């Protein structure tokens, strides 16, 4: 069983009197920086000079420094810039300025797990990974709640790395909801696998293929859109609130029977086999290697696929339907 920590098992004491440098002030960086400051901790921001984020962080009362200087001033460093920017920034601005014994925190294990970032042995390396976008991290904190998070220790130089991870999780409000202890490998691999076979890749293709089937059978695209995309949110909300069995108890008997008998014929063992193949590509590092090479070439394949997604017929129909639902 997973080890779950709440507010009672976490303390801010390990961070008291320490300087926390948040590297990056995007959606996640801003949310975590504000929450940590509101929890009574000393927070500075590390950014490239002159950008909009610099102006925003300054206007919100933070002391802002160039990344290297922020790292030199810090006892605890949160690396909250986009994954694919991290290796270059790490090599050029973070690693040369690290002090012995500092704590470095990541929100995702990708670069460390796959060896794109190789931390020195004389620091703590931890992860606090909120399981929600930055907007929710901030809003839930302000509401007196929190979003769940994963915590992990990659390197425990001080002997207190887990205490630092739990303190950061408490500082951003995550222990109010509960944090699960994991590893860099488990967080990274399950995150990528979940995105690919269910959350982004799986759902997207299931919806698109369902739309195509209905339209090819002669049904109106607008009706098809409502049936396979718009109503998907209603079902997902039920699953989120009640679980799969609870969702089944919230739909009609006709929907129950049709779903339970036809669903396994469509998402069959062959689909499960392909899911496992995709999962093994992640676990082996094959996907990471492919993606890093793609990114370093300027992401031509990604741009092509994004254009195909943008021009899919469901997007034109969806644009009109969303105007009806939400206004122009």
From Swiss-Prot:
Species classification: Archaea, Thermoproteota, Thermoprotei, Thermoproteales, Thermoproteaceae
Protein name per UniProt: Ketol-acid reductoisomerase (NADP(+))
Gene: ilvC
Domain KARI C-terminal knotted: 183-328
Cofactor descriptive note: Binds 2 magnesium ions per subunit.
Ranges for domain KARI N-terminal Rossmann: 2-182
Keywords: Amino-acid biosynthesis, Branched-chain amino acid biosynthesis, Magnesium, Metal-binding, NADP, Oxidoreductase
One record GO biological process: L-valine biosynthetic process
Job of this protein: Involved in the biosynthesis of branched-chain amino acids (BCAA). Catalyzes an alkyl-migration followed by a ketol-acid reduction of (S)-2-acetolactate (S2AL) to yield (R)-2,3-dihydroxy-isovalerate. In the isomerase reaction, S2AL is rearranged via a Mg-dependent methyl migration to produce 3-hydroxy-3-methyl-2-ketobutyrate (HMKB). In the reductase reaction, this 2-ketoacid undergoes a metal-dependent reduction by NADPH to yield (R)-2,3-dihydroxy-isovalerate.
Binding site for Mg(2+) 1: 191, 195
Listed EC numbers: 1.1.1.86
Residue numbers annotated as active site: 108
